[in-house]
Each structure stands twice: as structure tokens, then as C-alpha cells.
Amino acid sequence: MSNYLSSFLLASSLITGTLWIINKILSHNLLDSKIPFNIKKSKIYYKSKQVVQTFASFFPILIIVFIIRTFICEPFQIPSESMMPTLLPGDFILVKKFSYGIKNPFSNNVIVFINTPKRGDIVVFKHPNNNAINYVKRIVGLPGDKINYNILTKRLTITPNNINEQHTKNISINYKYIKPNDFTKHFKLNNIILNNVHSLESSNNNLLQLEMYQEKIEKIAYNIFFKKKLIDQKDLYFKQFSQKQGTWIVPKHKYFVLGDNRDNSLDSRYWGFVPEKNLIGKVVFIWMHLIKKEGQWPTGIQFDRIGNIY
């Protein structure tokens, strides 16, 4: 949807821009004086000029919107639960497009470099296997990092600078259990199994309460969801050549991303790394949250969801 809108804005800007130039030329006194009086008074000329002026008037607005969406910021809506508890379905987010650089809107190549992505950044990006689909996840692995994800404890181990097989110390990662509250969500186990992403050790009932933890990678802390009884189907993991399943070394100019809702997220564990070229921008702000139930119209706006994302 976002790609179609960008194409529409570009096409509309080009068309209205052309009409804007034509209107300026036709309105020039020197050219206007050379047009015969009988032509200027004809209905066809009058209506044609009106049409040109009307469409040309949209050009300044369209070009401003196009520039803002392409180079400055762009709104997105969160459709799924993969980034809970940080981002919820119904959140409308603002993405800073120039966080890492100003890009060519056609080739997506960086024109002006600004900064490199940081560990912990929440980013919107084009899916590595389908550029028509936009995803939102959190960067946990930088180029050169060796990532290990334990399917039993749901904990990360990150060792930096592994591209040249250098031996370095693991990055400090700490986990702190957060007491359950009304925000913690229940999921139907049957639905999770049908997604072919998870299997269960055992279950005595139909509902499983996810647990909230604080994950702190060095100085960056955020909350995540997972349940130890829910075991990932490791055979579905992306298998990197020469690495054990569940272990990856992030190549140059690529990133390893995870959803904060670890048991309900298709991310780099399943389809691999995100090329730097695919990054659209960094999520910086929630500007609206609609209150709605699945299959129903929104019933209101939740104002306490509005604000910066850290």
C-alpha cells in the first residue's frame, strides 16, 4: 500500500508539475498578448485554461507531501502482534526516513550518509524476499555479530567482530522478569500450532499466558514477550552455511532483526538477514492508536499510547 501511494504521489507530482509549468507559460504577459482575441474568448480555450489551472494548483501540495514522505518521515500502521509489548496492533507510527541517510527513491541507494543503524533500533524495512512487503522489527545483530538464540530459554548470545573469525567477548545481555499485569496477553495454543512456527512441550489447558521480561543488551533495555513452554520449531530456522542451526554470523551491510513478541514473530530466525539497502527508516513516534476489536470498526482513540519510542 505504501509503495503504491509513493508511486501515485510521484506520478501526480510529475503530471501536475507539467501543468503548473504550462499554466505559468500561458499566464506570461508576453505570450498572452500574442494569442488572438477570438481564441482567448472561445469556450474551449477558457475551459482548457481552467482545467490546467485547477490541476496545476495541486502541484505545490503534492510535491511537498512527496518530499516529506520520501526523504523526511512516513506514517505506517502496525497490523500484527509481533512487536508487542512495544508496538500494538492499531498503533500508527512515524518513521524517520533520514535516520541512516538520504536515499535515492528509485534505486534505494544512499545519496548522503548520516548514521549507521544501532543495536536496539526499531526499524521499518522491505522484506528481503519480497520488497513489496514492509516489516517492522528490532535490530539485535550488527554486521560481524555472531548470534545464538536458545530455543529453550529464549535468550540471546551475541559475540561481535566475527567476520574475520576474531575471538572476542560476548556482549552483556541481561534478562529481568516483570510481574504479570492486565497488559499481559493470553494466546490460544491451537492457533499458534496452526501457524507452523511453534510446537509445545505440553499443555493442560487451551490458553497460555505469555511472560514479560526486560531484555537489556549493554545499555539498551526494552520489554519482550515469550513463554518457555513454547518451543520454536528449529527446523524452520534459516540455516546459514557452516553454522549450526540457531546460530548465525551477520554479513557485512546486513542486520539481524527480531520481534519483541518472540513467540509470535516471523523474523531473521526464519528468513535471514536484512540488507542495509532495504531499511526504510527508524521508528521514532506513535502518533495515534485506534481502539478496535478484530472484525469491527474502531470505537475510539487511546491517547496514552501517543508518544516517543525509546
Curated annotation (Swiss-Prot):
Enzyme class: hydrolase
Enzyme Commission numbers on file: 3.4.21.89
GO molecular function, a single term: serine-type endopeptidase activity
Topological domain ranges for the Extracellular compartment: 79-310
Transmembrane segments: 5-25, 58-78
GO biological process: signal peptide processing
Keyword Cell inner membrane recorded: no
Location, primary (coarse class): membrane
Cytoplasmic domain ranges by topology: 26-57
Pfam families named in the record: Peptidase_S26 (PF10502)
Keyword Transmembrane helix: yes
Keywords: Cell membrane, Hydrolase, Membrane, Protease, Transmembrane, Transmembrane helix
Active site location: 82, 137
Membrane topology: Multi-pass membrane protein
GO cellular component, one term: plasma membrane
Cellular localisation: Cell membrane
Coiled-coil positions: none
Catalytic activity line of the entry: Cleavage of hydrophobic, N-terminal signal or leader sequences from secreted and periplasmic proteins
Family: Belongs to the peptidase S26 family.
Name listed for the protein in its UniProt record: Signal peptidase I
